[in-house]
Amino acid sequence: MGEEGRSNARPVGVIALVLLFAIGTCASFISAVSLTFPGSFLEPIWNLNPNARTGFTRIGSAAIVLMIAVCIACIFTTIGLWLGRRWGYWLAVVMLVVNLCGDVVNVISGIEPRAIIGIPIVGVILAYLLRKRTRYHFNNSAI
């Protein structure tokens, strides 16, 4: 394989991020459907994070709109990352920074102390995305 083939190869870390955002797409879609139809067969998913259910219930129908927006953003991020597009890269960075801010607020405010687990994870993912080699993939990808 020549040098040209290597530069266009999709890095394993990018594939992992594509899977992460695809899972985010599914999770946000299921959340939106569950919030739209409370008490449905999807209700047990909230046992994973009852605090989220309580918070979403407090904000009412805006939670459904929020989850649909997250779902759409995850779809576009997944596609953009898979195709190696700069806009996909920047969507991923923005979504992860927003997630990081949310985790920090949740931990500091005491709303969701378990969010502390997400802080270093998002930090590592952002560090990966900000690496020169990763940025190069999105600046020069022909995929």
Where would I find each of the regions flagged by the language model?
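Topology signature of small-to-medium multi-pass alpha-helical membrane proteins
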Residues: 1-143
